[in-house]
Amino acid sequence: MGDGGAERDRGPARRAESGGGGGRCGDRSGAGDLRADGGGHSPTEVAGTSASSPAGSRESGADSDGQPGPGEADHCRRILVRDAKGTIREIVLPKGLDLDRPKRTRTSFTAEQLYRLEMEFQRCQYVVGRERTELARQLNLSETQVKVWFQNRRTKQKKDQSRDLEKRASSSASEAFATSNILRLLEQGRLLSVPRAPSLLALTPSLPGLPASHRGTSLGDPRNSSPRLNPLSSASASPPLPPPLPAVCFSSAPLLDLPAGYELGSSAFEPYSWLERKVGSASSCKKANT
């Protein structure tokens, strides 16, 4: 009985110890869960939990180092970022990068304001002092807006002028190139030009037994190339004759030697009249023999 009561008395103590051990295990598991949750945070969440303002960054730097570093005045923000490997690194942003500053709104000018500003720019490209103050008051603008507009307008004008100069230079270069090509082609044409053909009289060979006066009149002078018939041949009827060959044929085809009894006249039809005279003489001889 005593042993059973002692065991029953020890039971609650053991259960308490086991419960305490369970509590310690639970604390350990909870800490592990917290670490796991902390490891699952994104870099932006870690950056959000870190110093999110210049004052917070300076305070964290003062707490960690005890005094501001030598480059503390040149920076305005420090951000803690966890990379893909789980390493936490600190990123220091420069003072010139102001993330909290709102974006500047773009100034929109009305048509009347633009017309007036353009007229003033055509009159004078630099408006300063009292003129700028008066112009800003009339257009219901600030002096800074007027000054910036004039600066942008001068920059645009310089760009336009440089673009025009480039276009003129390119056009002049193309014109010079075209002119040089034309001159080169003309020079080539002058060098490759065919010489003029010599006169027909120089190409015509001299006929054997033909006087010089007949050569010039029968071949060179076109006025003497018209057909002329002798009185004897005109009396007798003759069939139509083919037209005379041009004088060029004499220069291309070889000339045959004519018999000594065959005399050339000034007309191209005299050979036919000579044949007619020969035929007539032969017929008269036959009649005489009969």
UniProtKB/Swiss-Prot annotation:
One GO-annotated biological process of the protein: embryonic eye morphogenesis
- Major localization class: nucleus
Q: Which residues bind DNA?
A: 102-161
What molecular function does GO assign, one term? Answer: DNA-binding transcription factor activity, RNA polymerase II-specific
Bias-annotated ranges (Basic and acidic residues): 1-17
Which GO cellular component term is one of those annotated?
chromatin
Report the Pfam families cross-referenced here: Homeodomain (PF00046)
SUPFAM superfamilies this protein is in? Homeodomain-like
Q: Classify the source by domain of life.
A: Eukaryota
Give start-end positions of Low complexity composition bias: 222-238
Annotated region Disordered: where?
1-75, 205-240
Q: Which InterPro entries match?
A: EMX-VAX-Noto_Homeobox_TFs, HD, HD_metazoa, Homeobox_CS, Homeodomain-like_sf, HTH_motif
This protein's record includes keyword DNA-binding: yes
Does the keyword Transcription feature in the UniProt annotation?
Answer: yes
User: Where is this gene product found?
Assistant: Nucleus
Ordered alphabetically, the record's keywords are:
Developmental protein, DNA-binding, Homeobox, Nucleus, Transcription, Transcription regulation, Wnt signaling pathway
Instruction: Enumerate the transmembrane spans.
Output: none
PANTHER family from the UniProt entry: HOMEOBOX PROTEIN EMX-RELATED, VENTRAL ANTERIOR HOMEOBOX 2
State the similarity comment.
Belongs to the EMX homeobox family.
Q: What does this protein do?
A: Transcription factor that may function in dorsoventral specification of the forebrain. Regulates the expression of Wnt signaling antagonists including the expression of a truncated TCF7L2 isoform that cannot bind CTNNB1 and acts therefore as a potent dominant-negative Wnt antagonist. Plays a crucial role in eye development and, in particular, in the specification of the ventral optic vesicle. May be a regulator of axial polarization in the retina.
What protein name does the entry list? Ventral anterior homeobox 2
Give the organism the record lists. Answer: Homo sapiens
The major lineage groups are: Eukaryota, Metazoa, Chordata, Craniata, Vertebrata
